[in-house]
Amino acid sequence: MERGNVVKIFPDTDFEHACQELENPQIDGWEFFTESHGITIYRLYNEKSGLYEYKIYGTLDDVLPDICAKVYMDLEYRKKWDTYVYELYETQKDDKKVIYWNIKYPWPMSNRDYVYVREMREMEYNGKKIWVVIAQSAMVPSIPERDGVIRVDDYKQSCVLTTDGKVGSRAYMHYYDNPKGSIPTWLINWAAKTGVPGFLTIMQKACRGYPEYLRSKQQAPGSSI
């Protein structure tokens, strides 16, 4: 199904629910996990996997939401500022674009890789412009598993951005994946409690540097943008 010339991957209701979460957080039954640097995290135990899924609410004080959305979607730029990226690319498979992402894990653990689809929509909700990105793992036989890398095939994420009414952004993220293998509990807790706020700080810096990155691309020999 297409909207204009854009393939619709996820149903409209998924985007509507994500918008609602930003304006009216649905946290009944969720456990408060941590709060740091303006970021609040809740978690919910998944009985099937024995892992947690997370809801993250926060603000990015000096970055506009349209820039955040562009940085979030720009894979080439991601490879420059995210040190955990080992390999990352987008490819066309059948009627949709698919992303392959190989993430560095600390030694002696194996890297994890993801094959997934995503969709971004710019929406109007309660009189506000909102950017919503939804991603989910996908089965793509032509991108087989690799030796020494663990394939994460149970992954879902939604990210919502809007203005904070000033010069920053309000953000909401819902995240779950099953990285498989024997990952220590302390590492999982660190990633959620410390890694998420730390990542958002790094992303905020990347957003500030995005205009300069685009200018450098335009000035590069052979540039077509």
List the model feature ranges, each with a label.
Residues 1-225:
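Eukaryotic helix-grip
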